[in-house]
């Protein structure tokens, strides 16, 4: 449940900087006196403490955008709730009929839930998402389970329309930077998810034995202390990301949505690193509220 304070209460309780004239839901917020956070491609973002749930700063963190493949974290949570990692499914043609990114699921081949989770979280396989949905009772049933899980977690602005995050008959879906962090925190509390999202690579079945699949979260290579994340992109969502990093005994989580990368400007990874660096440099007692 959101516990972010209103702008008035925040100013009374703990000196917060809010953009002039903006409502709390549509404001830049960070502790007063803290170093200004540079702009970057993401139009909405949030920085929070992964363990305590304290929000360190945000920009339009409650404004909804399509989540793209970051919604796969929610699918993974449902799968981990309901499936044995060693349970198997034989993929059918419908599972593989997906706009790629794909991990290489083949009709007629048997896969374990764990293999599909690797393909889902490391390379954002839409075919893996479809096949997990197959295991969970079909696309419609799975989407309903995902939305029920989001509601249970307090991610009340999140609405999945497909298991993969691709546009579906119900549109592009929606989430917020706040909700993506709430969902990712819950996922990181699951040891299997935390292990998979931190893997730099894994092996996945192919026609020629096992093939190496490489984690698309470039922060694992670029940012010391990165411990996992999930990327996303569609034309409607633009660039999205949610992920976590650890330093000095602290763990922070960020979410970034609707990234508009400009030629010559900072990349999405640059902005992610900036948000983490800013958060780790902030006094651990400073915050603007809680998730």
UniProtKB/Swiss-Prot annotation:
The keyword ATP-binding does not apply. SUPFAM superfamilies: beta-lactamase/transpeptidase-like. Its main location: periplasm. Its EC number is 3.4.16.-. The keyword Endoplasmic reticulum does not apply. One of its GO terms (biological process) is proteolysis. It is an enzyme of class 3 (hydrolase). Probably cleaves the terminal D-Ala-D-Ala dipeptide of the peptidoglycan stem peptide. Shows significant D,D-carboxypeptidase activity in vitro. Acts on the synthetic penta-peptide substrate Penta-DAP (L-Ala-gamma-D-Gln-DAP-D-Ala-D-Ala). Also shows weak activity on Penta-Lys (L-Ala-gamma-Glu-L-Lys-D-Ala-D-Ala). The catalytic domain binds weakly to peptidoglycan in vitro. Plays an important role in the maintenance of colony morphology and cell wall permeability and integrity. This is D-alanyl-D-alanine carboxypeptidase DacB2. The gene is dacB2.
């Amino acid at each position: 449940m959101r516990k972010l304070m209103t702008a008035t209460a925040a100013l009374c309780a703990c000196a917060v900087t809010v953009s002039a004239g903006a409502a709390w839901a549509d404001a830049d917020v960070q502790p007063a006196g803290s170093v200004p956070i540079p702009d970057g491609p993401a139009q909405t973002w949030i920085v929070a403490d992964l363990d305590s749930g304290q929000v360190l700063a945000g920009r339009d963190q409650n404004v909804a955008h399509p989540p793209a493949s970051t919604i796969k974290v929610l699918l993974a949570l449902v799968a981990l709730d309901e499936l044995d990692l060693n349970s198997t499914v034989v993929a059918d043609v419908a599972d593989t009929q997906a706009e790629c990114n794909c991990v290489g699921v083949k009709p007629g081949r048997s896969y374990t839930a764990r293999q599909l989770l690797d393909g889902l979280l490391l390379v954002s396989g839409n075919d893996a998402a479809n096949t997990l949905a197959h295991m969970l009772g079909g696309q419609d049933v799975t989407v309903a389970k995902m939305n029920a899980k989001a509601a249970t977690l307090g991610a009340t602005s999140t609405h999945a329309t497909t298991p993969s995050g691709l546009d579906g008959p119900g549109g592009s879906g929606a989430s917020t930077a706040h909700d993506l962090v709430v969902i990712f925190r819950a996922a990181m509390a699951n040891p299997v998810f935390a292990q998979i999202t931190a893997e730099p690579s894994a092996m996945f079945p192919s026609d020629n034995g096992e093939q190496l699949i490489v984690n698309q979260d470039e922060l694992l290579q670029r940012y010391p202390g990165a411990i996992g994340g999930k990327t996303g992109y569609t034309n409607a969502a633009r660039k999205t990301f949610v992920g976590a990093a650890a330093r000095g005994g602290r763990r922070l989580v960020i979410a970034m949505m609707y990234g508009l990368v400009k030629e010559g400007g900072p990349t999405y990874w640059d902005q992610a690193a900036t948000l983490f660096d800013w958060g780790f440099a902030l006094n651990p007692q400073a915050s603007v509220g809680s998730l």
